[in-house]
Amino acid sequence: MSSSVRRKGKPGKGGGKGSSRGGRGGRSHASKSHGSGGGGGGGGGGGGGNRKASSRIWDDGDDFCIFSESRRPSRPSNSNISKGESRPKWKPKAKVPLQTLHMTSENQEKVKALLRDLQEQDADAGSERGLSGEEEDDEPDCCNDERYWPAGQEPSLVPDLDPLEYAGLASVEPYVPEFTVSPFAVQKLSRYGFNTERCQAVLRMCDGDVGASLEHLLTQCFSETFGERMKISEAVNQISLDECMEQRQEEAFALKSICGEKFIERIQNRVWTIGLELEYLTSRFRKSKPKESTKNVQENSLEICKFYLKGNCKFGSKCRFKHEVPPNQIVGRIERSVDDSHLNAIEDASFLYELEIRFSKDHKYPYQAPLVAFYSTNENLPLACRLHISEFLYDKALTFAETSEPVVYSLITLLEEESEIVKLLTNTHHKYSDPPVNFLPVPSRTRINNPACHKTVIPNNSFVSNQIPEVEKASESEESDEDDGPAPVIVENESYVNLKKKISKRYDWQAKSVHAENGKICKQFRMKQASRQFQSILQERQSLPAWEERETILNLLRKHQVVVISGMTGCGKTTQIPQFILDDSLNGPPEKVANIICTQPRRISAISVAERVAKERAERVGLTVGYQIRLESVKSSATRLLYCTTGVLLRRLEGDTALQGVSHIIVDEVHERTEESDFLLLVLKDIVSQRPGLQVILMSATLNAELFSDYFNSCPVITIPGRTFPVDQFFLEDAIAVTRYVLQDGSPYMRSMKQISKEKLKARRNRTAFEEVEEDLRLSLHLQDQDSVKDAVPDQQLDFKQLLARYKGVSKSVIKTMSIMDFEKVNLELIEALLEWIVDGKHSYPPGAILVFLPGLAEIKMLYEQLQSNSLFNNRRSNRCVIHPLHSSLSSEEQQAVFVKPPAGVTKIIISTNIAETSITIDDVVYVIDSGKMKEKRYDASKGMESLEDTFVSQANALQRKGRAGRVASGVCFHLFTSHHYNHQLLKQQLPEIQRVPLEQLCLRIKILEMFSAHNLQSVFSRLIEPPHTDSLRASKIRLRDLGALTPDERLTPLGYHLASLPVDVRIGKLMLFGSIFRCLDPALTIAASLAFKSPFVSPWDKKEEANQKKLEFAFANSDYLALLQAYKGWQLSTKEGVRASYNYCRQNFLSGRVLQEMASLKRQFTELLSDIGFAREGLRAREIEKRAQGGDGVLDATGEEANSNAENPKLISAMLCAALYPNVVQVKSPEGKFQKTSTGAVRMQPKSAELKFVTKNDGYVHIHPSSVNYQVRHFDSPYLLYHEKIKTSRVFIRDCSMVSVYPLVLFGGGQVNVQLQRGEFVVSLDDGWIRFVAASHQVAELVKELRCELDQLLQDKIKNPSIDLCTCPRGSRIISTIVKLVTTQ
């Protein structure tokens, strides 16, 4: 049980009402009452009295423990909602069943025993042996005053024990607890300006002595700045100590007279502090004024705090007991007066700033400068500024010591001079306020005594010296008296350091071996140049427009480090420019051979371009030309031109920030403005300043090349014209005219009635849409030429007369169709009519392939089905057409089919998303039909919701699509939007992806790169070419803090380091880590692989019902994720029986074999990553796992039984999902119960599935996606569901979800668990009261809360130090097994 949590009394019967002012608390009827209960907080009702806990900690009649600052549920009231604000969608009257938190007697006893044992370990390690059981209950783990005594006094000696009397104990090895660093001591030291990691390491070295630790840090810090000036001269050594002591006492007396109570001699002749009121500092760094809390405590009735008497009460002024010293306090065998100076400085005078003067033993002040420290509790004052002030003051102290003058009052005067101190505030960086490069791991608060719990680790501590300044251990407990807990301790754990070393080794550049390889490559290239095959391909390359600019490009690269190349589609920039650079270098000396990396936005383009270039070089891919994508790498030691995805290069930068051995970075398709490419530009902009030899080439479309040139300090731009035949461009009005398309009444592509104004609706009365248009047509005969419409008004809002005025020269029949057409919809009927006109119509354009651009897979399926019912396209009578869908979800083999030229007389029709816009080039395309729409990810930062929305393309997209035609002959492009819409409504450029996606993963990537780790996120994002909105960044930082990956001061936690090293969404990464900790690694990796890639369930167009029924057969525990797990297990079993069996299993169960294989590959890669960071067996490699696998993915066997002992526990797996996905929780609202009369009485009826309502806290009502196994469920045992993502289409949908029960939410839900007494029931709440349960008893509530506290601490320890083996560690193993049993049996 965490000893940092104080036990509080059981609430009395408070009489407060739920108004804005709490009522007066009732009296407690306990026998040991220490006062009446406090009044209830605003709106919270009356508070109860407190009584001290008895030694029987968890008896039913005993106190329950709540957090020190319980938060009331935030329930919106009408008075708090202004007129302009929307009313919150969550309402407290929601019909959500309030579940009860039960615990069996057996489990209660098990948890009690565990907590007692854990508490005894803490008490034994941190308290005196003579304390009673009652005192042990409240003993803090940081208490160990036996190590300290007042200066000048010695502890009483205990007589030697008779050796015969204790002979039986000789063989018993005494218990030596692992030393635990007090978090309050760390917080105390950090307020002097030192980094918490440094504080921890020094405290451990000094056995927790805060005074010794502070003096050591100050000495080390000052010695680096002042060096020789700190040495004591021989003359000073001759001065008598008595003389120095006399002068020091005189100065202390004078300071007491001048400063009054502000001056405190904490330890006689050793430590002085002077309280300061530096208003200029406070106002300069004021952010928010903390609210003052009021107290209503009867002081006289309180007992004296025993920790205060010992000198180390960490609660200070917040302590609920009296801080008074009896006349003669007896402690142990020593009669002494208690040194309460550690409290007086805070309680007697609340100063934000203190000047601290320290004298070591035998110090010769004023002939020797004292140690000077500037201390502040103002959290807004940067740590570095505090150290700069201390150094400034110590410099003055050294100067005064040279003339043997007292310095303290002069230092006070200096601090009060604003002009002097303000100069020091500009520098917010200091070596000792930043973490060191290497440091010792922080020891766990969880005491682990078994040697097997830790692997042997040799720490490397670069900043703690071997010699400790000789400091007398006085009775000085300098821990913080604040009750708000320590700041998070950040540890770059050793496993992550090892991971970075391993990554760096992958990219070690050995110049000697590389140059030797280069010599062979040059020789082979010269030989190859003479071959016929090479010369034949060279002639084709020389016909490309890019070849004409070859010398210009090479000359510019010799003069400039960064060059922007702007080229039209088809100019050859992607394939030729890297070869220009490589060929030029191969004709030179071996040490000058280029090593080029060319990034591509998509995997398909990286593969296809690499294969094309290798073919042009008359070699197979993987030699001098290779590619690398996630999970697939085709390259060798001879590869000098590598095509890779942008993510692969960013991952390399984590371990190789200098890009060793790389001569050129080419960023292709930079105009697409993906999140990764924009971030890569920022990284490269930093690297080029550090590596003058690295050259960067940005390749872009023609529209925005200047934007990138300006970003790189106006670097030169080369424009390459495209090699395309003329392309005739037509718009919607032209397409309607050539096809003579007529919109039928009742068509789904007609405008809705809502789009017609109310005035026209009244005038229309009962006329149909066509009758209305006929009337407009008649009136248009009188339309005057001067009638016009503003260009800003979109066509969708215009009626017939207005359209006729806008489109002069267009036939009235076309205008008639346009006036009733819904331009927001993709008109598949018109596309079919255009295809018929192209394939079978009479026109002068040459035959060729047709490329149709549609927004997404759904539209592709609909058009494909529609064309299958048309005899011209279905090939039932004649083989006229061949239709190929093209989508990123298709396999590489399926995608390659679009490049195959059809037989003569057969028209190839490709129905594609925007993947065909820039990523691939299909040479034989003559016709392009552009629907004008695309799927674009949008992100609402305020709701934390992603949506995939149909949006209009930009002008740049439209030009790119047009450019796909005319590669081999004159082409035609039909845009299914009007010419006016193109000229006046379309954006010039698409919104950059970084401005419309969540930023969590990018934040982690920024922080894991050494070049940005010390910068705040806002400053890094502001340097992007077009930064995202600050609201989006703020929301991402909040989510990362809630997840435990980022601290409030924007530093990575240990969990953050691990999540940053995993190339997945942060929630998926957390699922993998928790699966490892709770020994259900294999199923956790399976679910993680599916979430990172896609679901293996498929739904054929003509067998949707059958496919859904098959998926329901896998349904288990109301969870899509567990259904997926069941399906994957079945596939693994089938693979062991052979390829045929695996194929049949997938076909019968509507599963994608390709997706399952990709998931298996991902699982192996994730296993390797977990092995690298210490969360799986050491040395696991994905390739080795695949080789050893005998059917299936091989992960279960590779990771071992220990890591998967709970792999068959579905309840625990659901709990892991809760740990990873929280706070993505949906409430299930049930309608009021309906009853049906039967012969035995009224029976409650199950509600229909449609009657259930699903609500999220921030977004209100959502819907379960029809593909979910929970879509038709009528009853859920628990009213809470977890989900990974929300999507917004026509409505807000939860795609996949999983029911979660009470215990996983309480134990693994993020944030604070609150326990409150409401109407006689103990209510356990999460998330500000949005999730609530009723505890069966207050004992159950307390047990669960205390167990949660222990679990949180254990998880922190494991994540900080992955070398802890929770399987063999007694403490960790017991906590884990208890949690597993609770989750499984309750």
UniProtKB/Swiss-Prot annotation:
- SUPFAM superfamilies xrefs: CCCH zinc finger (SSF90229), P-loop containing nucleoside triphosphate hydrolases (SSF52540), UBA-like (SSF46934)
Please verify whether the record's keywords include Ribosomal protein: no
Under the heading InterPro entries, the entry gives: DEAD-box_helicase_OB_fold, DEAD/DEAH_box_helicase_dom, DHX57_UBA, DNA/RNA_helicase_DEAH_CS, HA2_WH, Helicase-assoc_dom, Helicase_ATP-bd, Helicase_C-like
Residues carrying Phosphoserine: 127, 132, 475, 477, 480
Care to name a GO molecular-function term for this sequence? RNA binding
Keyword match Metal-binding:
yes
Start and end residues of each Helicase ATP-binding domain = 554-721
Catalytic function, reaction form? ATP + H2O = ADP + phosphate + H(+)
The organism's place on the tree of life at top rank: Eukaryota
Q: Which Pfam families match?
A: DEAD, HA2_C, HA2_N, Helicase_C, OB_NTP_bind, RWD, zf-CCCH_4
Q: What is its EC number?
A: 3.6.4.13
Which key words are in the record? ATP-binding, Coiled coil, Helicase, Hydrolase, Metal-binding, Nucleotide-binding, Phosphoprotein, Zinc, Zinc-finger
What are the start-end ranges of the zinc fingers (C3H1-type)?
Answer: 299-326
Comp. bias intervals (Acidic residues): 133-143
Q: Which residue numbers delimit the UBA domain?
A: 180-220
Residues covered by region (Disordered)? 1-106, 120-147
Q: Where is the composition biased (Basic residues)?
A: 1-11
The residue numbers the entry assigns to motif DEVH box are: 668-671
Give every Helicase C-terminal domain span.
830-1010
Coiled coil regions, renumbered to chain? 101-125
Residues annotated for ATP binding in this entry: 567-574
Composition bias (Gly residues) maps to 12-23, 35-50
- Functional summary from the UniProt entry: Probable ATP-binding RNA helicase.
Record family assignment: Belongs to the DEAD box helicase family. DEAH subfamily.
The record, for PANTHER family, names: ATP-DEPENDENT RNA HELICASE, ATP-DEPENDENT RNA HELICASE DHX57-RELATED
The entry's protein name is Putative ATP-dependent RNA helicase DHX57
Please tell me the species this chain comes from. Answer: Homo sapiens (Human)
Q: Which gene encodes it?
A: DHX57
